[in-house]
Amino acid sequence: MDATTIDLEQMGRAAKTAAMTLGQLTTLQKNTGLLAMAAALETHADTILAANKADLAAASALPEKFVDRLALTKARIADMAAGVRQVATLDDPTAQTDRAWVNEAGLTIAQKRVPLGVVGMIYEARPNVTVDAAALTFKSGNAVILRGGKEALHSNLALATVLQDALAAKELPRDAVQLITDPSRAVATQMMHLNGYIDVLIPRGGKGLIKAVVEQATVPVIETGAGNCHIYVDAHAQLQMAVAIVVNAKVQRPSVCNAAEKLLIHADVANEQLPVIAKALQDHGVELRGDERARAIVPSMHAATAEDWDTEYNDLIMAVKVVDSEEEAIQHINAHNTKHSEAIITDNYQNSQQFLQQVDAAVVYVNASTRFTDGYEFGFGAEIGISTQKLHARGPMGLAALTTIKYQVLGNGQIRKN
């Protein structure tokens, strides 16, 4: 159900009805729907590209990195379809029993995974999120209400229509996937207050969007992360490894949330290693902003401000700080990070364990790039987002994160005696 004059409660009722049906589908039925959606994306690629062309024309004055995320090609649509097919191969969490036991009264208690119900998504101008969210929610037995960025409205509408038609052709609920076509903030705010219809709301986008949803929503929210990610080069770090990891984490895709934004380096190795790491970054076009001690070693750095330590750049910019101890590095990270992904480079086992235990983040790495924080890399398949909160789900969220627990208890007439 789509509407130009939005009746969100009507959409919510339709989603609830669809969710009841989805919760009863077999894994085979859900996979059939997913394969139909994947095929439809490929069949209707020209229609989707025409809609995307309209969005791109309106966005021509926006920054290049924004336009790149918005743009679709036949290859990107093929990748979307492949992603949907890959979701079809994943284990269905709702077909599993987590554990079962018999209690002292003879009751058989089974802990099962069940769908959340209706998932709401508020996200920026990334058409791929429309498809990823539809595939993951459908496989996990949830209905989804999507509200994408206004810059991608034509693309999202084309994609949602293709997915809905594919489901309907297989006699599956069309309202399993619904798109809000009014991009106004007023409607977004109304969506955030759709208690009784939306079971959980997941924002995906920049810090401002996520902050607005977390602060304004009255429905439960899973906070997905802005990524102010750090790499700490310990006193026992191998230089070659440090260069490779830092460059990969910063340069490969600087606009994504798992890119590194800050470099901390121990004073004992800073004079030797920082000039080499800095040159490698600068050779890739990275602007470095250092504290006073870092600039004394690499004078070409710009001066870092207090604001820099809390900024997610999403760009080829990195702030650098020299620290005197691992404890200082950990304190700095915990004071300024967004609880997303943090890494230490070290050959010292004790230091690695201290970092793993004391850094407060969804994902903590030893001798690896923060770029691995991703559903595919973790073996979850596509992800609905990367949670930086601690309740319900944390880190890359795959299918299991879109379910909750139900206890099924079987008896033969037992009554409680006390």
UniProtKB/Swiss-Prot annotation:
Locations listed in the record: Cytoplasm
Annotated Gene Ontology cellular component terms: cytoplasm
GO biological process, one term: L-proline biosynthetic process
Catalytic reaction(s) noted: L-glutamate 5-semialdehyde + phosphate + NADP(+) = L-glutamyl 5-phosphate + NADPH + H(+)
Annotated EC: 1.2.1.41
Keyword Membrane recorded: no
GO MF: glutamate-5-semialdehyde dehydrogenase activity; NADP binding
Pfam families: Aldedh (PF00171)
Signal peptide extent: none
SUPFAM superfamilies per the UniProt record, alphabetical: ALDH-like (SSF53720)
Pathway(s) annotated for this protein in UniProt: Amino-acid biosynthesis; L-proline biosynthesis; L-glutamate 5-semialdehyde from L-glutamate: step 2/2
InterPro entries xrefs: Ald_DH/histidinol_DH (IPR016161), Ald_DH_C (IPR016163), Ald_DH_N (IPR016162), Aldehyde_DH_dom (IPR015590), G-glutamylP_reductase_CS (IPR020593), Glu-5-SA_DH (IPR012134), GPR_dom (IPR000965)
Keywords: Amino-acid biosynthesis, Cytoplasm, NADP, Oxidoreductase, Proline biosynthesis
Main location: cytoplasm
Superkingdom classification of source: Bacteria
Function: Catalyzes the NADPH-dependent reduction of L-glutamate 5-phosphate into L-glutamate 5-semialdehyde and phosphate. The product spontaneously undergoes cyclization to form 1-pyrroline-5-carboxylate.
NCBIfam families xref list: PRK00197.1, proA
HAMAP family registered for this protein in UniProt: ProA
Protein family per UniProt: Belongs to the gamma-glutamyl phosphate reductase family.
Record-given protein name: Gamma-glutamyl phosphate reductase
Species the sequence originates in: Lacticaseibacillus paracasei (strain ATCC 334 / BCRC 17002 / CCUG 31169 / CIP 107868 / KCTC 3260 / NRRL B-441)
